[in-house]
């Protein structure tokens, strides 16, 4: 009887959110993102790729709404800004045909998943011809925590084959703000077009003095990002963002 009541509760909660449209979910996550007016944070990024090693990269990041970003680092290497600091609304604009997932295996009542078709132009991929463009159709599953209105997982795949999975882990920081404390990006790439794009992205983090000569079209690895020493909504001078 207890399990039946629990099942009915989960079903009712899921139906309540499903009665909303995807735009409602996106707006709620975007509103939550914009409640953070500014912050600074220390970030450590490590990359693990088979047969390749590199030291951890440390960054200090300053962010101020709506789109001011300043990244400081020692030595070579740049932190890709797209995706990490852009709003959910902007990130969702890289998807088309956004709808609710039909996957009914989830049991967390504070969770919902959206599915969208990835807009290839957002990847800056070199697609050789129109036929390749028509047959190359990645989809993206976005898992949203509907209690805190944050994105916890982004899974990119072609058919049922995973090519990239991002997981975000959150906690309360600086007394009262729910922010990511760790993110992981796992690659499972067998497609030459995507491997070249990912090689370029990883090379950017490492710095231009590093050459990503991975001989295979296969890129399989893990990028880990740890966040620490948050200072949230304490104000940041505009001069910080001047070059």
For every predicted segment, state its role.
Residues 8-51, 102-105, 242:
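N-terminal leader/targeting segments and the immediate start of mature chains
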């Amino acid at each position: 009887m207890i399990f039946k009541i629990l099942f009915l509760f989960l079903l009712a909660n899921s139906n309540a959110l499903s009665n909303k449209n995807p735009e409602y979910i996106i707006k709620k996550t975007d509103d939550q993102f914009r409640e953070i007016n500014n912050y600074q944070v220390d970030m450590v990024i490590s990359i693990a790729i088979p047969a390749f090693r590199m030291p951890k990269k440390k960054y200090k990041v300053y962010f101020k709404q709506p789109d001011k970003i300043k990244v400081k680092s020692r030595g070579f290497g740049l932190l890709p800004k797209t995706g990490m600091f852009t709003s959910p609304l902007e990130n969702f604009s890289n998807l088309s045909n956004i709808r609710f997932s039909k996957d009914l295996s989830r049991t967390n009542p504070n969770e919902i998943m959206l599915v969208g078709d990835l807009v290839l132009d957002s990847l800056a991929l070199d697609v050789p011809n129109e036929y390749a463009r028509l047959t190359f159709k990645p989809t993206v599953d976005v898992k949203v925590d509907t209690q805190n209105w944050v994105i916890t997982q982004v899974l990119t795949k072609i058919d049922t084959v995973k090519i990239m999975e991002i997981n975000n882990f959150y906690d309360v920081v600086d007394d009262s703000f729910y922010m990511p404390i760790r993110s992981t990006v796992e690659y499972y790439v067998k497609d030459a077009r995507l491997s070249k794009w990912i090689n370029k992205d990883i090379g950017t983090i490492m710095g231009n003095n590093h050459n990503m000569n991975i001989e295979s079209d296969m890129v399989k690895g893990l990028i880990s990002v740890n966040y620490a020493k948050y200072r949230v909504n304490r104000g940041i001078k505009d001069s910080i963002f001047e070059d």
